[in-house]
Structure formats: C-alpha cells, structure tokens
Curated annotation (Swiss-Prot):
Known role: Component of the yop secretion machinery.
Protein name: Yop proteins translocation protein P
Gene Ontology CC annotations of this record: cytoplasm
Taxon lineage: Bacteria, Pseudomonadati, Pseudomonadota, Gammaproteobacteria, Enterobacterales
CDD domains referenced in this protein's UniProt entry, alphabetically: T3SS_YscP_C
The entry's keywords: Cytoplasm, Plasmid, Virulence
Species in which this protein is naturally found: Yersinia pseudotuberculosis serotype I (strain IP32953)
Encoding gene, per UniProt annotation: yscP
Entry similarity comment: Belongs to the SpaN family.
Length: 455
C-alpha cells in the first residue's frame, strides 16, 4: 500500500477523494450529538463564520442546525480495478465534554460542504480511469514510490492523510526504459538491409546519436567481403591496443588500401560521414598501422594524413575562396626577416681577431705629471697614425697626428659617426678643430645675431 499525503481539505483548491458515506454520516451525527449535549455547559462563544453554500440558500435563520447535516449517502459502487480512497479516521472525542467544541463544529461544517462534491469527483476519477485503460498493457512493472519530504516545495500542509490502494493491472508487454536499439537484418545475404527496432522509453539526443554510431560500427564490422576478393593479407601487428573500438581498428588494419580507396570512390558520402565522426587520434593510429605494415616496394596508395582530411588542397583553394579569399600582404619587413639569419658567436670573435691583426696596434704609456698616452696605429689605407690622449683637469684631450690625406678621411668618418650617434641617441658631441678659431667663435654667437647687417 502506497501512502500519499495531500493538502488539508480546508483549502478550496484541493478536493478529497471519496469515502464510504455511512462512516461520514456516523461521524457527523456524533459531532452533532456532542454539540447538542454540551450546549448548556459551554461558555458563550462567538458564532463561527460559515461560507455561503448552495443548500443554505432559502433557509431561515432558525434552521442553522440543518446545515451541519450531510446529504443522504449515495450507494457505494464497487468496480474492479478501482482505487479505494478514504480519509484517515479522526480521534474519538467522547471523553472531551469539558473542552470548547467550536473548532470541532467548524471542521464538521467544512467537511459537510466538501462531502457534497464527492459524486462529481467520483465521476472525474471514473472518466480518467476509463481514458487510461487502453494504456494498461504498457504500465506493468511501473511503480510509483511517494512519500513526505521536507525539501519538496510541494509538501502538503494539511492534517488529513490519504491512503491509496492500487490493484494489479493486467498487461502483456513490460516497459523497458533507456534501452539501446537492436538491429535485426531482414536478409543475411543482402548487404545493408536492416531494421532498427526501438524499445519503449525516453531517449536523449546524445543516446540516440551513440546508438546510431554503435549500429553503424557493428554493420561495418559484420559487412561481408566481395566475391572477387581473395584472403586478406595480415598487415597489422598481432598485438592491438585494447580500445573501445577494437573490432573497428582491426577491420581497418586488415582491409587493403586498394579496397579502402574503391569503397571511398563508390560511397563518397559514407566515407565523409565516417571520417567526420572519427577523431584525430584514431586517424593517426590507423594511418600508422597502414604505413608500418605495407611493403614500400609494392605499388600501393599512400594513406591520407589527418591534416589532409581536414584541410583543403592547394589547388582547390582558389575555387573555394575565389570570392572571399584575399592573399596576405607582404611588407618589406617580411622580406628582410626572411633573409636574416642568426649569427654565431664564434664568427664575431674571429672578426675581432682579424681586425686586430690588420690594425697592428701599439700602445705606449708614459709616466709623469703630464699623464699623456700615445697610441700608434698602422692602417692599410691611412698609413701610420699616432693618437695622443692627454688628461687635463676636468677634460680629456685627444690629438691625432697623421698625413693630410689621412686627416681628411678621418674628418669625414668622424662626421658620419657623429651623425649616426645623434640619430641613435641625441647627445652633446662635437668635433672641433683648433685652427678654425673663427668658426668656433661663430658657433658661440646668438642665433639672432646672424640677421644683423655687417659693416
């Protein structure tokens, strides 16, 4: 027996199920007797407010007691397979003569009002049962376990409990929930003839896709070989890793490459769908098995690589992207980066050694108060050059002694060096000659003095 708790019958939106009317009439008569016997002993109490009922219309004020009586009980009808529904019996109040019975009277009034609608509710239940009777063969084995839970948002708040007794329903076919489809071939000799039988139950899109994929893989594994084909050569290693698709991997390895190419040509849509469903790891494993087992000396078709299955070929790019495809912009910096290469550290040291050998540097340091340092250089193009470095308080004096042609080349090189240094980092650098005193004094003039007229 299943126990179902409903809302209190005092709430108008919930209707109690039917009960044998003789028990209801006895309960109401008992409550009326208690009210009549204790009418003089009870303290004066306020009249309880009662809702207006259809059977109270047209009655006089003195006939209030008649409203507590329920209508005559209807003949109880028993039908096979119907649920016996009833209210839990109330506690006995025979020893409670000294208590205030106004709540009891109010409860009896409300019950009498609700019991009048039992006949209409019985008709509704009977119509629902008649509508559900054709579904009886599909409902065998389905049980409904119900109970009270404090966490449920629809927990009833009433005081009465409802008891439901279910009778067994005859059925011929049990219900199977969430089962996989079974594939039954119509003709074992026919290739591709099959019937998918679905069981009764709720299936999600993910489970449907998985079932279809399993049936397709099973069909590929059990597909008969061609009549003109000979025994398959063993091109796969004997030990195959245990994966969920062991039979599929074994079949792929055992199938020659030529047969795979012929099937792909005959059924392009089938090959495309199958390649889309397989992930990259499976494709890589299968291509590895094919390349390891096939002899390279024989004329065989090279298996496609995983990236070739996903990316289009180069010759199809202009056709596919003729409208939207644009060539990438190549800048001069891209060409420069393409020509640049990383230099080795050893090459830099070798170049420094060669430069030192060609310069033939001689360093002479003389002691004394003057602190003058002389540097003698013998250059291939400039010839012999002497550099004198004198340390003056607060300054460093550098003097170059060379031929006239060498000094001209050095002046041009110093100008170029100064210009490049100013571009990299602007600093206050200046190369001045001691002979041009007029030019030095002219640089010290103010900029506005250049506009004055000379006398």
């Amino acid at each position: 027996m299943n126990k179902i708790t409903t809302r209190s019958p005092l709430e108008p939106e919930y209707q109690p199920l039917g009960k044998p009317h003789h028990a209801l009439q006895a309960c109401v008569d008992f409550e009326q007797a208690l009210l009549h016997n204790n009418k003089g002993n009870c303290h004066p109490k306020e009249e309880s407010l009662k809702p207006v009922r259809p059977h109270d219309l047209g009655k006089k004020e003195g006939q209030k007691g008649d409203g507590l009586r329920a209508h005559a009980p209807l003949a109880a009808t028993s039908q096979p397979g119907r649920k016996e529904v009833g209210l839990k019996p109330q506690h006995n109040h025979q020893n409670n003569h000294d208590f205030n019975l106004s709540p009891l009277a109010e409860g009896a009034t409300n019950r009498a009002h609700l019991y009048q609608q039992d006949s209409r509710f019985d008709d509704r239940v009977e119509s629902i049962i008649n509508a559900l009777m054709p579904l009886a063969p599909f409902l065998e084995g389905v049980t409904c376990e119900t109970g009270t839970s404090s966490e449920s948002p629809c927990e009833p708040s009433g005081h009465d409990e409802l008891f439901v007794q279910q009778s067994p329903i005859d059925s011929a076919q049990p219900v199977q929930l969430n089962t996989k489809p079974t594939v039954q071939p119509l003709n074992p000799a026919a290739d591709g003839a099959e019937v998918i039988v679905w069981s009764v139950g709720r299936e999600t899109p993910a489970s449907i896709a998985k079932n279809q994929r399993d049936s397709r893989q099973k069909r590929l594994a059990e597909e008969p070989l061609a009549l003109h084909q000979k025994a398959l050569p063993e091109i796969c290693p004997p030990a195959v890793s245990a994966t969920p698709d062991d039979h599929l991997v074994a079949r792929w390895c055992a199938t020659p490459v030529t047969e795979v190419a012929e099937k792909s040509a005959r059924f392009p849509y089938k090959a495309t769908v199958q390649s889309e469903q397989l992930d990259m790891t499976e494709l890589a494993d299968r291509s590895q098995h094919l390349t390891d087992g096939v002899d390279s000396s024989k004329d065989t078709i090279e298996p496609p690589r995983p990236e070739e299955l996903l990316l289009p070929r180069e010759e199809t790019l202009p056709e596919m992207y003729s409208l939207s495809f644009t060539a990438p912009v190549v800048t001069p910096g891209d060409h420069l980066l393409a020509t640049m290469r990383a230099t080795r550290l050893a090459s830099v040291s070798e170049q420094l050694i060669q430069l030192a050998q060609r310069l033939a540097v001689e360093l002479e340091l003389r002691g004394g108060s003057s602190q003058v340092t002389q540097l003698h250089l013998n250059l291939p193009e400039l010839g012999a050059i002497m550099v004198r470095i004198a340390e003056i308080p607060g300054k460093l004096h550098v003097e170059l002694i060379a031929s006239r042609e060498a000094l001209r080349i050095l002046a041009q090189g110093s100008y170029d060096l100064l210009e490049r240094l100013q571009r990299i980092e602007p600093t206050q650098l200046d190369f001045q000659a001691s002979d041009d005193s007029e030019q030095e004094s002219r640089q010290k003039r103010h900029v506005y003095e250049e506009w004055e007229a000379e006398e």
